[in-house]
Every structure is written in C-alpha cells, then in structure tokens.
C-alpha cells in the first residue's frame, strides 16, 4: 500500500511539473507593457521579451534610458517616458498604449518600477522619508494598473506585480517595506477581482539582488546623511560606533547579493507564457531558502534571527 501511495505521489508531481511547462501560443501577436525599464530587472525583461517576439512597450523614466534601450532592441520594441507618480503622465501613456494595441488588448502588464528610499531606524526618520517609496512603489503601481486594466481585460491577459521579500519581512526602517507589504495586499485583492474576467494576477518576490535600486554605497550615503542631522539625544542613544558598524554592514551586503537578474526575468517569463502560471514566484536562493521560509515562522523566531544581525546601540536607556 505504501509503495503505491509513493508511486501516486511521484506521478502527481510529474503531472504537476508537466502542467506548469505548457506554454501559450502565438506570442508574436501579443503586446506587453513594462515599467521601470531604464535599468535592472525591467531593462533585462524588455530586451529578453523583445528577443522572444513579443511587442514590448517599455516605460522609462529618463530619455537616456529610453535611447539606450532602443539602441539594443528590435523595431518591435517601443518606449514611452513615464513617471508613475504623475497621474496625467500615466493617463497619456495608457491612451497611447490603447492606440498601439487596438482590439488585441494588452496581454501583459509588468509593474516593475520601484525605489528603495531611505533605509534607517524608524526613530531617525520623518513622514517625508516614507512618502516617496510609497508614492512610487504602491500608488504608482496602482495608478498604472487601473489605467491599463481595461486593455488587459480585453486580452484576458496577465498582470505581474514585482514586490519583494521586503513585502514578507520588514528588516529595516523606512518606506520600502510598508510599500511592499501594501503591494502584496493590492495584488491579492486584484487577483481575486480579476478571476472572473480571465485575467491572471501574479506576484514576484525577489530576494537581494545587485541593482541600482539596492546599491549599498548609495544606501549607506543616505543613512549617513540622516545621521548627521539627528538630534544629540538620538546620537547619544545610538553612539558613533553604531553608525560606523552599520555602514560597514550595509556595504558588506554587496558580497552576498544575487547578481543574476535573469532569475527574476525567468519568473516574469513563466507568469507571461505558461498556460498555468503560479500566483507567487520567489526569485533568488536567499528568498527561497531563507526569507520566504522565515516569513512563515513565529514572530519570536523571526525577531531572534533578524536581531542577531543588528548592531548594538551604545546607550538605549538614555531617553
């Protein structure tokens, strides 16, 4: 009996994997729209899907990013300049995309644009330090989605929201994790709303990757700039040794981040082209083996493991 149960489980696993590998047909007549294509995941995704034969519409924040991308891709790829925090800019872009795709609609929307913002202890920050990541990562994503949604519904297509392991575990103060937690919530509600329309909504949760967004040198510079303007009381509580060690720790992350950005693009590819896409994708070994498993553990264990990495404060009782 146990033998046949084992055989059944192996067969089910084989059939499940086979099902996941089935692909859609006729990608050469399908349009996809990707935000945040100047650099990083979005740039690689635009170039990859252009080579595969999709009609790619790549949204770039800068003219230089747009020009560089067009120089590396085929005539099928079009770029638009887009600031996702500008509602009028988003509306104009959506109208332009509508004119491009016509009755075919938009097969894929990849919400990739995002920023890290300031990463520092919460008691160092002001409300304004939280605002920019939330405006870009959350409200920008929602704005683009709502404006493009009629086109995706017409094609019965796919929406792919790039979140982060920072949407599962908050490991630093600032607006990044709150914005990504909110993206996860929006993603879940949108997925359920769009089910009846035949639109599949997926979420990608990358681990730590080497991109412009997560450049440890820039992150350290921002943290040091905030430190210099803190009140004497806060500086006394944390101590000079804290800022020195925490900056070293930040810069040290460069040695263990994922460098292969294609791991994220492969998730996008599966979500776009599989007949049976997943609802969630973890990208990077750290996400799969540490961050995601840790997110399912009790808070007391999460705190124990994450606080072990924290730099000690000089005098936290000096309040």
Curated annotation (Swiss-Prot):
Cleavable signal peptide: 1-17
Main subcellular localisation: membrane
Binding-site residues, NAD(+): 34-58, 83, 180
Catalytic reactions of this protein: 3beta-hydroxy-5alpha-pregnane-20-one + NAD(+) = 5alpha-pregnane-3,20-dione + NADH + H(+); 17beta-hydroxy-5alpha-androstan-3-one + NAD(+) = 5alpha-androstan-3,17-dione + NADH + H(+); androsterone + NAD(+) = 5alpha-androstan-3,17-dione + NADH + H(+); 5alpha-androstane-3alpha,17beta-diol + NAD(+) = 17beta-hydroxy-5alpha-androstan-3-one + NADH + H(+)
GO cellular component: endoplasmic reticulum membrane; intracellular membrane-bounded organelle
UniProt superkingdom: Eukaryota
Protein name as it appears in the record: Dehydrogenase/reductase SDR family member 9
Matching CDD domains: type2_17beta_HSD-like_SDR_c (cd09805)
Quaternary structure (record): Homotetramer.
One GO BP: progesterone metabolic process
Annotated binding of substrate, by residue: 164
UniProtKB keywords: Endoplasmic reticulum, Lipid metabolism, Membrane, Microsome, NAD, NADP, Oxidoreductase, Signal, Steroid metabolism
Organism field: Bos taurus (Bovine)
InterPro entries, alphabetized: NAD(P)-bd_dom_sf (IPR036291), SDR_fam (IPR002347)
